[in-house]
Amino acid sequence: MSRSISKLRETKETKVEIFLDIDNKGEIEVSTPVNFFNHMLYTLLYYMNSTAKVNVVDRQNYDDHHVVEDTAITLGQAFKEVLGDKKGIRRFANTIIPMDDALVLVAVDISGRGVSNVEFKLKRNTIGDLAIENIYHFFSSFSYHSGVNLHVIQLRGKNTHHVLEASFKGLGMSLYEASRILFEEVRSLKGSL
């Protein structure tokens, strides 16, 4: 049985449509009005080994904030819902991703507690058409709405693109590993997540 979901979020600011299948690696389509964000989302979904379609319409064209935030909310909710009761999932995973000069640690716990800690040492305020502050916002919003405890820590790196791409690769790989069904029971001393 494949774990897949379609999710729609509509506000006066954006319309976000997401299809996500976390058990079958297939075609990935990403379309938002923020080009660098498209690159990061595609990277995340690719390294999750997923099949996915993300389509975002910006109804107000203020800036990149609402696009990033609403996408993170919707993707987080979709990931949480597709996991169901989380029975048998590995739950924990971490990766250390090198990308040229960059080295980034990403760790996740699918605990139901969406707390994030993101530590970058970046010198730029923007990359392409995306504000760096909205990368932080993506991770915190995704973490909160998915119920995934998330840590992203830049260990090394001077190139902003490399650091961010390594972060999204690491998140994708960690989410894939943590969501694999390996056990019969819920992996919690409490008996539920």
UniProtKB/Swiss-Prot annotation:
Pfam families: IGPD. It is found in: Cytoplasm. Its EC number is 4.2.1.19. Disulfide bonds: none annotated. It is an enzyme of class 4 (lyase). PROSITE patterns: IGP_DEHYDRATASE_1, IGP_DEHYDRATASE_2. Its main location: cytoplasm. InterPro entries: IGPD_sf, ImidazoleglycerolP_deHydtase, ImidazoleglycerP_deHydtase_CS, Ribosomal_Su5_D2-typ_SF. Keywords: Amino-acid biosynthesis, Cytoplasm, Histidine biosynthesis, Lyase. GO terms for biological process: L-histidine biosynthetic process. GO terms for molecular function: imidazoleglycerol-phosphate dehydratase activity. Belongs to the imidazoleglycerol-phosphate dehydratase family. This is Imidazoleglycerol-phosphate dehydratase.
